[in-house]
Amino acid sequence: MVEFVEINGAQLAYRICGPEDAPLVITLHGGRGMGNHQSDFKAFSPLGDSYRILSFDYRGHGQSSRTKPYTFEQIVDDIDGMRARFAGPEKQVIILGGSFGGFLAQQYAIKYASHVSHLILRGTAPSHHHEEGAIKTLEQRLSKVPSFSIEMLKDKVFGAFDSDLEFRMVHLVMSPLYSESFDANAALQSCLNNVYNAESHNDLYSEKEKYFDYTKDLHRITAKTLVVVGDKDWICPPENSKFIAKEIKDAELFLVENANHSVHVEKNDLVVKKIRSHLEK
């Protein structure tokens, strides 16, 4: 059941499961302006037998309030607000972020290093330069998405949408890129049910926000880190995860064969098993 909590002036939608006294895992979803907590909560709730799993929609996303500002820094501070509310002011948590959520997870683990015991990153990148790799990958896979284009990726997905409807339509036509086994009917239903907020997307891709770069700060991360990526990840190609794992002290890289950006869904049992093993070390 979805519940709501006020954090830093915003009403944030969340789900939580698992024993109240267990270590808290906060999952961070991807998708600037279009993501929500539901997929991650479903994917990672099997860990709820031993951990408390908290998944939430960022401000301006999903069922959470459209409370500005929509910035990386504000969302990172909201994450810490959720940590303090559900774990306690002095408690460490496990941060699990994928894609855009992985960007936020890195920023959180740098800014609030003492608040993170373990960091799990999925299909993400250490800087905005992943966009160059995504464009090259799309050039090779355009046959999978005949209604999508390089221009749409550059100018819309990595730029700005004119409306929520345009956002929804572009996301539908690009959906086959995300998984190695695409279900068109499920993709249509997902796009119909999903909330698209062009304003929050555009703010988070604005000139002030889009040029994030953690490459020089990854060494400041002290959490025990696992980096998971599918070998076919199109939008955050594996070289990004390899770089992160190399720069964070004692980080472990888990490269999953025949999996794409949605590796945690495509290879759910394998990924959950690996996360459990990492947390039990």
Swiss-Prot record:
UniProt GO BP: melanin biosynthetic process; proteolysis
Pfam families recorded: Abhydrolase_1 (PF00561)
EC number: 3.4.11.5
Record GO terms (molecular function): aminopeptidase activity
Catalytic activity: Release of N-terminal proline from a peptide
UniProt keyword Zinc-finger present: no
Organism: Pestalotiopsis fici (strain W106-1 / CGMCC3.15140)
Function: Proline iminopeptidase; part of the gene cluster that mediates the biosynthesis of dihydroxynaphthalene (DHN)-melanin, a bluish-green pigment forming a dark layer in the conidial wall that protects the conidia from UV radiations. The first step of the pathway is the production of the pentaketide 1,3,6,8-tetrahydroxynaphthalene (1,3,6,8-THN or T4HN) by the polyketide synthase PfmaE though condensation of acetyl-CoA with malonyl-CoA. T4HN is not stable and easily oxidizes into the stable form flaviolin. T4HN is also substrate of the hydroxynaphthalene reductase PfmaG to yield scytalone.
Leading EC class: hydrolase
Record family assignment: Belongs to the peptidase S33 family.
Annotated protein name in UniProt: Proline iminopeptidase PfmaB
Lineage summary: Eukaryota, Fungi, Dikarya, Ascomycota, Pezizomycotina
Domain of life (superkingdom): Eukaryota
The AB hydrolase-1 domain, residue ranges: 23-267
Disrupted gene: phenotype observed: Does not affect the production of scytalone.
Keywords carried by this UniProt record: Aminopeptidase, Hydrolase, Melanin biosynthesis, Protease
